[in-house]
């Protein structure tokens, strides 16, 4: 079954949160095991971050009831386009994680909805659609060196 996520704006923290489609309206993670991501150490992921809810290719904090630690998701295929040469999205997102002024939340929300989520809807399973993880979050990806399908749960 394909994993589907929705994008929700959290105005209180000025970040975009990824939520599994089918989660409760209050943004709580879906129950049940969706696959595993081994953690570098048991203490690397707090208990309230729902390590058992890890989806292949996503850091466990993506499923926290508080949302992911930082705005860090994008499409690798879009990273290769000339559009991103002007926006320099990774640098923009990194500035936001440091609390510096950069692209507005509205612009970022539009970028994600247009580029990433539209790809998921139109293309379905796309092995080149990846997760881009910025530094600063301790919930790192621990796999995905080669193309893999993080749309499908384990």
Curated annotation (Swiss-Prot):
Transcription regulation keyword on record: yes
GO biological process terms, semicolon-separated: DNA-templated transcription; symbiont-mediated activation of host NF-kappaB cascade; symbiont-mediated arrest of host cell cycle during G2/M transition; viral genome replication
Record-linked Pfam families: X
Signal peptide boundaries: none
Residue ranges the record marks as coiled coil: none
Chain spans, region Mitochondrial targeting sequence: 68-117
Family note: Belongs to the orthohepadnavirus protein X family.
Name of the protein described by the UniProt record: Protein X
Source organism (scientific name): Hepatitis B virus genotype E (isolate Cote d'Ivoire/ABI-212/2003)
